[in-house]
Amino acid sequence: MNSELDYYEKFEEVHGILMYKDFVKYWDNVEAFQARPDDLVIATYPKSGTTWVSEIVYMIYKEGDVEKCKEDVIFNRIPFLECRKENLMNGVKQLDEMNSPRIVKTHLPPELLPASFWEKDCKIIYLCRNAKDVAVSFYYFFLMVAGHPNPGSFPEFVEKFMQGQVPYGSWYKHVKSWWEKGKSPRVLFLFYEDLKEDIRKEVIKLIHFLERKPSEELVDRIIHHTSFQEMKNNPSTNYTTLPDEIMNQKLSPFMRKGITGDWKNHFTVALNEKFDKHYEQQMKESTLKFRTEI
């Protein structure tokens, strides 16, 4: 029972969604955030390829200039809106002090996104990934990032994931809510699996959405610079600049595998059957379809 208490000790609900306690403490600042019309929001459920799509977008903004992308770490170039860790991290403050055009990272579901983003009609990119691979990646994230309780065994963690008892709540609700928002021409809805399968096609889609002109040279440069191996070895994207007491990559690297289908190495037959049954219940009303392998 104690381990259950320890687990929830780190989190607090905000509008019915489980969230990191440190973030909730300053929630008023997040809700009151003032968007600008030329802000671009990159929204994802955690562990869905946020850093990957962020670096692609940043490269489009910088017209493929790799050196400009390496001038600072990604969490300074694209601040994490709701992130707050006392004096260490403050997404709202970072963004307030930033010149336009700003790129804003968030894991918030649409109903928690500050109202000013909708009022200013900001463009939003939403990237999602199949639930099984997200659950695996989230499990390893719990193990290596400070501020997370012990996730228990993998099957125990999957149970919590299925019930939405993880930061940012239910994956099912998150993706379904954003899928509805994706019907707006101001929201581009992308799948991680599509990026893995045909990166060129998805990069061109992003360039068009951002109203830039695609050239073969630009697309080639983006594809090379944002490949998994390049980003894993790049200190401005691999989070190795963070001290071990915040993110201990000796336990699990931040850039772990970057593949589709790793869930097969973690789900037993019984766990997979249980997950599939629950998944079907949660997603039966939705037209949203995912691929768990490519």
Swiss-Prot record:
Tissues in which the protein is found: Liver, intestine and at lower level in the kidney.
Primary localization: cytoplasm
Broadest EC class assigned to this enzyme: transferase
Source species of the chain: Homo sapiens (Human)
Catalytic reactions of this protein: estrone + 3'-phosphoadenylyl sulfate = estrone 3-sulfate + adenosine 3',5'-bisphosphate + H(+); (24S)-hydroxycholesterol + 3'-phosphoadenylyl sulfate = (24S)-hydroxycholesterol 3-sulfate + adenosine 3',5'-bisphosphate + H(+); 17beta-estradiol + 3'-phosphoadenylyl sulfate = 17beta-estradiol 3-sulfate + adenosine 3',5'-bisphosphate + H(+); 3beta-hydroxyandrost-5-en-17-one + 3'-phosphoadenylyl sulfate = dehydroepiandrosterone 3-sulfate + adenosine 3',5'-bisphosphate + H(+)
Name listed for the protein in its UniProt record: Sulfotransferase 1E1
Effect seen on changing residue 85 to A: Does not have decreased sulfonation activity towards the estrogens and DHEA
PANTHER family found in the cross-reference section: SULFOTRANSFERASE SULT
Residues holding 3'-phosphoadenylyl sulfate: 47-52, 129, 137, 192, 226-231, 256-258
Gene Ontology biological process terms, A to Z: 3'-phosphoadenosine 5'-phosphosulfate metabolic process; estrogen catabolic process; estrogen metabolic process; ethanol catabolic process; positive regulation of fat cell differentiation; steroid metabolic process; sulfation
UniProt keyword annotations, A-Z: Cytoplasm, Lipid metabolism, Lipid-binding, Steroid-binding, Transferase
